[in-house]
Amino acid sequence: MPDESYFPEMLTPRDVAAVLSRAYTRWDGAAYAALLDRFALPARKPVRSLSRGMRMKLSLAAALAHRPRLLVLDEPTGGLDPVARDGILDILNDFTRDETHAVLLSSHILSDLEKICDYVALLRRGKLLFCEEKDRLTESCAVVRLPERELDILPEHAVLGLRRNGYAAEALVRRDALPPSVTAERTTLEEIVLLLSKHETERE
């Protein structure tokens, strides 16, 4: 599913159903109608009159109504307000409660990925920096904050990413490679991505 609605702007959600029900043999009209109700989408208003958030919800309703096992989504919550984003994430969580279903999505909103993803991958300029189980990644990494002049207490092989500001530094480290004397803090997916990306930029 792309990050923009692909439906002609003169169509209504009801028209969308009429077209797609002929294209998909597994189309579930009742499920589509239920999703329109859940998303508070007016069935008779043309697409051109819908907000960006409503268009995204319409695209998601159409994608789910033909009962797929795999959803591929590009920035599904991009540009949406927090309430609309939570609504999209709730639907995706409901979808993946069935263990035969999966969602593959790309997003720059890392807090969304942290909420719903089991596995995460980071691509930077075509290079795969990591592909890991999310919980294992956040548990195996940590952040050390210290004066920049004290960076040499960190074993070189333990440092995965680094950010300096001239006085202090933040280092993304492998927790199991730290000496006992070094205090490390729990980290988040967002910190991991930011520190790894910063480190890669400085190496280029």
Model-derived features with residue positions:
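Short loop/turn segments at beta->alpha junctions
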Residues: T12, E133, E185-T188
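Short, surface-exposed beta-edge/turn micro-motifs
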Residues: S59, S140-C141, A168
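Short secondary-structure boundary/capping segments
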Residues: F39, D94, K134-R136, G161-R163
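Alpha-helix N-cap/helix-start and coil->helix boundary motif
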Residues: R14, L110, L151, L189-E190
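C-terminal coupling/interaction segments
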Residues: L160-E204
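Conserved beta-strand-loop-alpha-helix hinge in the C-terminal portion
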Residues: K127-E150, P155
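Short, surface-exposed beta-strand/loop "edge" segments at domain boundaries and coil↔beta transitions
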Residues: L71-P76, E150-L154, A177-S181
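ABC transporter nucleotide-binding domains
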Residues: M1-S111, K115-R124, L129-F130
